[in-house]
């Protein structure tokens, strides 16, 4: 009986084992078939005669999203998409460095509220963009970076300029994808663009390999051998390559939706808004601090301005919110922010973050009631419970929140004494600036005085791009944006080199504006070559270079603290002549023509209005205006 039972058990085991093995084999075969796209190929066709290419799909999606410009430095990996964009009426603007292309896309994104687009070639082309992409991430700017790549089959096999680009950009971007089939271009780009603009905006990266962008006949020529090998293994390899080729192009030209996907923008709840209304209604000395997020869509700048004016609370404007109220608005307080924050009993941080710009929250009075609004939860609570504590923290869109807050406070009035106190302190501080403008300097021109002349010269339609350290930081105190979205600086990352790219993007998307660039001489070194770009593309901008022959923002603290100016010295370079060599117009200001400063600025303005890119090289000396402002 035992022998019979054992035999029966063994007899049942082997069929079960064979069934399991067969099932495993079938599953493996089906998995391989799925990965090779064999099932999809059964239901869809490959058009082997088509001369269309993936670049056309890229261009179609960009056009459907209202993209007007693509910034680039050309490379063979991305040529099809550039040619396709040009054919669809999207202006392709080529720069002299890839980082400039991304900075230009960043400027377009900030000024238009839509996605800005840059396209660069593989490997070094992409690595050259890293600083600009990180700057866009920190500034929360929706930039789409399109990057070329080696063919899908040649990745990780030593192809030219082939690196792991995805690992490089994942820490920098909200969304990263590598397109592996032509049919995936459209849905991938739609998803990427929606991700860039949803929630907290930021950069996204889409990798487009060579064989996804080029037409079938070109890819076939490179991928499939013309002569069929005799060996079995050789024939298997050819079959595999033919299948890979088919999977790349199967269903490539079937109609697909190309337009924008819905955006996910967080909103404050009615209960949160009501609690904030109650807090602010009890304030005696309220203060509003607006940051860049306040200018994000969907709330237009004019509606936000009307809301701030209706609210009637004194405010400080930072980042992209600079200029929201125009010049000399009675509610806009420009000086002594730390002192004002210490005195306020209720502070609304609307898009402002408690990072180094607000001394990590230490400038806030612990007895004040703090309302903070931000789309990003990390920014919302940054350094809270260390140096400050919010009474109400609202994760939501800042502009929409401000509209609802004002609606809830209709009829609320505050004593004019508080605003008048802040304005008086403002006026006293600005008088000290006027006094410093009259102080002599050892050589050349007083930069404070020069910037005062610039402030008086700027037209109402000026759009300011600022790129530098000491000269630009001084300008931030003295030069006022003429309106909303009329001031472009790098943002919290403090990146040097944004100037040319920002100016390029700004002038193209706002051609009616006069784009004035304020450069430090150190920062100008990054942008000089792009005057070739301005000339070639007929983009007239005017650059004012505060030339004090050094990295003065660093030296003003390094020298007294460490006793050396090592690596801080530059030369009084003839930047205006270098620009002239690139086809731009060049002017110079120094002590020799001090009495003609305004005249020369007007001359540069007229040249710019006549269609020229202009560099005004302003030789300046050094003052104690920013002593103590160590840059770490």
Curated annotation (Swiss-Prot):
Cofactor(s) listed: Mg(2+); thiamine diphosphate
Phosphoserine modification, residue list: 369
GO molecular function, one term: magnesium ion binding
Sequence segments annotated as region (Thiamine pyrophosphate binding): 470-550
Subcellular location: Endoplasmic reticulum membrane
Membrane topology type: Single-pass membrane protein
Binding site for thiamine diphosphate: 98
PROSITE patterns per the UniProt record, alphabetical: TPP_ENZYMES (PS00187)
GO biological process: fatty acid alpha-oxidation
Alphabetical list of Pfam families matching this protein: TPP_enzyme_C, TPP_enzyme_M, TPP_enzyme_N
GO cellular component: endoplasmic reticulum membrane
Function: Endoplasmic reticulum 2-OH acyl-CoA lyase involved in the cleavage (C1 removal) reaction in the fatty acid alpha-oxydation in a thiamine pyrophosphate (TPP)-dependent manner. Involved in the phytosphingosine degradation pathway.
UniProt family annotation: Belongs to the TPP enzyme family.
Protein name from the UniProt record: 2-hydroxyacyl-CoA lyase 2
Organism name: Mus musculus (Mouse)
Lineage of source species: Eukaryota, Metazoa, Chordata, Craniata, Vertebrata
The gene coding this protein: Ilvbl
């Amino acid at each position: 009986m035992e022998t019979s039972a054992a035999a029966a058990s063994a007899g049942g085991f082997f069929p079960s084992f064979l069934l399991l093995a067969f099932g495993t084999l079938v599953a493996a075969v089906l998995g391989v078939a799925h990965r090779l796209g064999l099932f999809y190929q059964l239901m869809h066709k490959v058009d082997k005669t088509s001369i269309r290419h993936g670049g056309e799909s890229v261009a179609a999606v960009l056009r459907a999203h209202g993209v007007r410009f693509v910034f680039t430095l050309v490379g063979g990996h991305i040529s099809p998409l550039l040619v396709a964009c040009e054919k669809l009426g999207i202006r392709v603007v080529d720069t002299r460095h890839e980082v400039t292309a991304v900075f230009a896309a960043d400027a377009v994104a900030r000024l238009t509220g839509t996605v800005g687009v840059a396209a660069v070639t593989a490997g070094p082309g992409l690595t050259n963009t890293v600083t600009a992409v990180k700057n866009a991430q920190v500034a929360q700017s929706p930039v789409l970076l399109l990057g070329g790549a080696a063919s899908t089959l040649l990745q990780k096999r030593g192809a030219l300029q082939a690196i792991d680009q995805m690992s490089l950009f994942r820490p920098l971007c909200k969304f990263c994808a590598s397109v592996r089939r032509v049919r995936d271009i459209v849905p991938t780009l739609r998803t990427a663009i929606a991700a860039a603009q949803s929630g907290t905006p930021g950069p996204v990266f889409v990798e487009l390999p060579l064989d996804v962008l080029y037409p079938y006949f070109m890819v076939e020529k490179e991928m499939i051998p013309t002569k069929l090998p005799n060996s079995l293994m050789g024939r298997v390899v050819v079959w595999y390559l033919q299948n890979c080729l088919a999977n790349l192009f199967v269903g490539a030209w079937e109609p697909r939706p190309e337009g924008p996907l819905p955006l996910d923008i967080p909103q404050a709840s009615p209960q949160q808004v009501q609690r904030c209304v109650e807090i602010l209604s009890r304030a005696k000395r309220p203060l509003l601090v607006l940051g860049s997020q306040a200018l994000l869509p969907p709330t237009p700048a004019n509606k936000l301005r009307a809301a701030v004016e209706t609210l009637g609370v004194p405010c400080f404007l930072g980042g992209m919110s600079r200029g929201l109220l125009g010049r000399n608005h009675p509610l806009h307080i420009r000086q002594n922010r730390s002192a004002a924050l210490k005195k306020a009993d209720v502070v609304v941080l609307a898009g402002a973050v408690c990072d180094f710009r607000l001394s990590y929250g230490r400038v806030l009075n612990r007895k004040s009631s703090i309302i903070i609004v931000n789309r990003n939860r990390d920014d919302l609570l940054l350094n809270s419970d260390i140096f400050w504590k919010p009474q109400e923290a609202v994760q939501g869109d800042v502009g929409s929140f401000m509209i609802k807050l004002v609606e809830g406070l209709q009829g609320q009035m505050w004593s004019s004494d508080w605003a008048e106190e802040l304005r008086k302190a403002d006026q006293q501080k600005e008088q000290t600036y006027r006094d410093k403008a009259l102080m002599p300097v050892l050589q050349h021109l007083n930069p404070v005085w020069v910037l005062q002349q610039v402030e008086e010269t700027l037209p109402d339609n000026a759009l300011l791009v600022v790129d530098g350290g000491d000269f630009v930081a001084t300008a931030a105190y003295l030069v006022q944006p003429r309106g909303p979205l009329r001031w472009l600086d790098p943002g919290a990352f403090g990146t040097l080199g944004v100037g040319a790219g920002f100016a390029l993007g700004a002038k193209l998307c706002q051609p009616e504006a006069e784009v004035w660039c304020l450069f430090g001489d150190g920062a100008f070194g990054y942008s000089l070559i792009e005057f070739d770009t301005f000339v070639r593309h007929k983009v007239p901008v005017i650059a004012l270079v505060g030339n004090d022959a050094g990295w003065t923002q660093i030296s003003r603290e390094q020298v007294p603290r460490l006793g050396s100016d090592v690596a801080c010295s530059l030369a009084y370079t003839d930047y205006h002549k270098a620009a002239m060599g690139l086809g731009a117009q060049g002017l110079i200001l120094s002590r020799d023509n001090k009495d003609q400063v305004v005249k020369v600025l007007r001359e540069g303005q007229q040249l710019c209005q006549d269609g020229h890119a202009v560099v005004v090289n302003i030789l300046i000396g050094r003052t104690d205006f920013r002593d103590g402002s160590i840059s770490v």
